[in-house]
Each structure stands twice: as structure tokens, then as C-alpha cells.
């Protein structure tokens, strides 16, 4: 039974992944549909709950076939969470952490997205960096006034001396504990996020530079399913995938061809695997009759936001991919969406480059020049003449 709590009256229902066309109902109220089965999403269900028994229903429709080129599974295949917060609280995915090197010193920036469902509220935002064992390293704070029934952003910037850097060889991690404390004694809201400190550069001449050193990527593509376990996401299975890659000598992975489970990214953070986090297998031109092409125009903005905002604090992610071997190749049908997608990613996260996999099968690469220009890093599929023959 649901017990109302005056100190934490706001309730959010969070879905990490439902394949597909997930339509959510709370006590008969239709909260809308989320078509893309690989996107995480959430609903504010506060207005629809009542004391006692409540009915939450999710209708899934995976009847439109063929909608993918690999095994998808169906239904609620990733975690579901019920999140209860005070009226003044952090929005879901409301903490963004970036690190950069300034005069050989690490600078940390925390951007907090704060919601206030009540009257104007003075508060203090506390951000504490700890070791994974809980040992406190430093604390920063900022006084804020949250306007009534508004969402606002607050930024904190501070130096982080003697930070241990994250890399595939030394995957050092920290925790950021952010606490919103109202000055009037109202309940505080706390969010804890794991992050790492690393510095990524790239150039045509030097390639990828991680923490000041050139690094070559020994990578592979991994789909979201877990073999005989199907598409259901179990923490141990996600970690096993990452562990097997690490033991086989890989130091990088591309999440083909959609955002992965959160547990897989956690494993990459802890084990030391660099990640290209990929959004879509295609844009407007179809590879299968009912694939993302029928959703693209209406949903790509929200699905990009879901991927970037959810995953941006993972130090393992060094690059965002906006597509895989898309059918569109020439301007304007390829170039305009590429600039729109890449631009939106950069607005959400200017700290990472944007790529996509372009496929010309070693022919006519020059037709890709206008499309390639929309990216920070160009993915060449496939440079077969560069590799050893079977």
C-alpha cells in the first residue's frame, strides 16, 4: 500500500528500458507513450497517487515487425524505480559533472538541475567529493534561492588537487554527494553520483590523447542482450560482458547500436573500458520496415537527451555516436540531420566529441565529405584494405 509522506510528497516513476511503445497508466490515467525501446524515461506520478492501493500498468506493443536488425527482447527488460523526494529536489539526471585540466590542475564543475514545487525557498547546495569507501576529500557549497514552481540550474566550480586520474589501466573513481538543504528546516534531498577525473583530447595528427598520453583503442561492438539470458538486464550479466572484454585485451567498446544498460556502463567505469555511447542504428531511411525511421522526426531530440543526460557522468564514455552506418549519405538528406543531432549533443555536453559510423565499403569516400564535416571524429566503416586478410 502507498503511504503518503508529507516530508517527501513528490513521486517519480523511472523506467530504464521498456521494449517498446511503452504506455504507462497510473490508476487509469494515461501518462503517455515512449516508443524507442532503448531509451530511459520517467513520469511524475504525484498527482495520480492515492493512499492505499494503486494500480500501475504498462502496455507494451512490439507487434510492428521487423523493427530491428538484431534480437531485441520485449517488455520491461531493465530496472524500474520509484523515487520519492521533497518538494524541492534534484531532477532525475539532474547532476552533471565535468572535469578539465587548467594550468596542469584539475577543475571540477557541477551543474545541478533543481525543481521546486512550492513557494520561494532559500537553500544551500552542498557538493562533497569522497573516496568510494566514503572518506571525505573536499566539500563546496553555494547559497541559492529557488523560485516557486520553477526549475533552475546552479553551477559550482572548484579545484580538485591531487586527483587520481581515470584510465583503462588505472580506473580510479570518486563519488559526488550533492545535498540540497533548505534553510527553513524543510527536508533535504540528496543525490550520489560516481565520477572519474580524466582529460580527453583528439586530433588528426596525434589521434586520441588520454591524460596527456596517446592511446590506441583495441575495441569491439557489443549489443545489449545477454546471450541465453535474453535481453533482460542483470547486473552480474552486464559486468560479465565487460569483464570478458577486459580479459580478452580490449580497452574500448561501442554500444551497438543503442544506449546500453546502466550497469554495463558502471562496469566499464570500474574495470577500465573506454566507451563510444551510441544512440541509433539509423535515421529517416529504413533498414527494416518498422525501425527507428518511423520515429526519428518526432522522437530523436528526446531520445538524444535521454542518452546524454543519463550517461554523461560516466568517465568511461569519451565519445557520443549519433548513428551507425546510416542509409543517407549525400546532402541534404544526410547532412542536415547530422548537424542537428551533433549540435544537440554538444549543447547537452560540450565536453565530449561526436562521431558516427560511416560505411562506404572502401568506395567513394569523397561523397561523405559534407556529412563527415558535421562530426568531430569520423568513423570509417570499413577500412578493410588496412587490415590483415583471412
PLM features per residue range, with description:
Residues 94-96, 176-247, 266:
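N-terminal carbohydrate-binding accessory modules
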Residues 87-119:
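Surface beta-strand/loop "capping" patches
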Residues 58, 127, 176-178:
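Hydrophobic/tyrosine-rich beta-strand signature of extracellular beta-sandwich/beta-rich modules
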Residues 1-93, 117, 132, 259-262, ...:
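Accessory beta-strand-rich segments of carbohydrate-active enzymes
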Residues 236, 242-247, 251-390:
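Substrate-binding/catalytic cleft of secreted carbohydrate-active enzymes
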Residues 83, 145, 194-198:
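Short beta-strand edge segments in extracellular beta-sheet folds
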Amino acid at each position: 500500500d502507498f503511504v503518503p509522506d508529507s516530508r517527501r510528497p513528490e513521486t517519480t516513476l523511472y523506467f530504464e528500458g521498456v521494449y517498446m511503445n511503452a504506455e504507462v497508466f497510473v490508476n487509469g490515467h494515461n501518462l503517455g507513450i515512449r516508443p524507442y525501446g532503448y531509451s530511459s524515461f520517467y513520469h511524475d506520478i504525484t498527482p495520480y497517487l492515492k493512499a492505499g492501493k494503486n494500480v500501475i500498468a504498462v502496455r507494451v506493443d512490439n507487434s510492428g515487425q521487423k523493427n530491428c536488425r538484431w534480437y531485441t527482447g520485449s517488455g520491461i527488460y531493465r530496472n524500474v524505480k520509484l523515487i520519492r523526494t521533497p518538494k524541492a529536489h534534484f531532477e532525475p539526471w539532474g547532476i552533471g559533472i565535468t572535469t578539465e585540466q587548467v594550468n596542469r590542475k584539475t577543475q571540477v564543475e557541477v551543474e545541478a538541475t533543481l525543481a521546486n514545487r512550492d513557494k520561494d525557498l532559500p537553500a544551500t547546495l552542498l557538493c562533497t567529493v569522497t573516496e568510494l569507501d566514503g572518506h571525505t576529500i573536499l566539500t563546496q557549497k553555494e547559497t541559492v534561492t529557488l523560485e516557486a514552481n520553477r526549475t533552475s540550474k546552479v553551477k559550482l566550480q572548484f579545484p580538485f588537487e591531487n586527483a587520481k586520474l581515470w584510465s583503462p589501466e588505472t580506473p580510479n573513481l570518486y563519488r559526488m554527494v550533492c545535498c540540497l538543504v533548505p534553510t527553513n528546516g524543510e527536508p533535504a534531498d540528496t543525490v550520489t553520483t560516481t565520477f572519474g577525473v580524466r582529460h580527453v583530447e583528439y586530433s588528426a595528427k596525434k589521434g586520441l590523447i588520454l591524460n596527456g598520453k596517446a592511446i590506441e583503442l583495441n575495441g569491439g561492438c557489443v549489443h545489449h542482450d545477454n546471450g541465453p539470458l535474453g535481453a533482460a538486464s542483470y547486473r552480474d550479466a552486464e559486468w560479465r560482458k565487460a569483464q570478458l572484454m577486459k580479459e580478452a585485451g580490449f580497452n574500448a567498446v561501442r554500444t551497438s547500436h543503442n544506449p546500453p544498460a546502466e550497469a554495463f556502463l558502471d562496469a566499464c567505469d570500474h574495470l577500465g573500458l573506454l566507451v563510444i555511447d551510441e544512440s541509433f542504428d539509423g535515421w529517416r531511411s529504413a533498414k527494416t520496415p518498422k525501425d527507428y525511421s518511423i520515429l526519428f522526426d518526432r522522437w530523436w531530440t528526446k531520445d538524444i537527451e535521454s542518452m546524454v543526460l543519463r550517461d554523461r557522468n560516466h568517465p568511461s564514455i569519451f565519445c557520443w555516436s549519433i548513428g551507425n552506418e546510416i542509409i543517407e549519405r549525400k546532402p541534404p538528406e544526410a547532412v542536415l540531420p547530422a548537424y542537428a543531432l551533433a549540435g544537440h549533443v554538444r549543447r547537452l555536453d560540450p565536453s565530449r566529441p561526436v562521431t558516427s559510423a560511416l560505411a562506404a565499403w572502401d568506395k567513394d569516400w569523397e561523397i561523405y565529405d559534407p556529412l563527415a564535416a558535421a562530426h568531430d571524429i569520423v568513423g570509417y566503416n570499413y577500412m578493410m584494405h588496412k587490415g590483415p586478410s583471412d
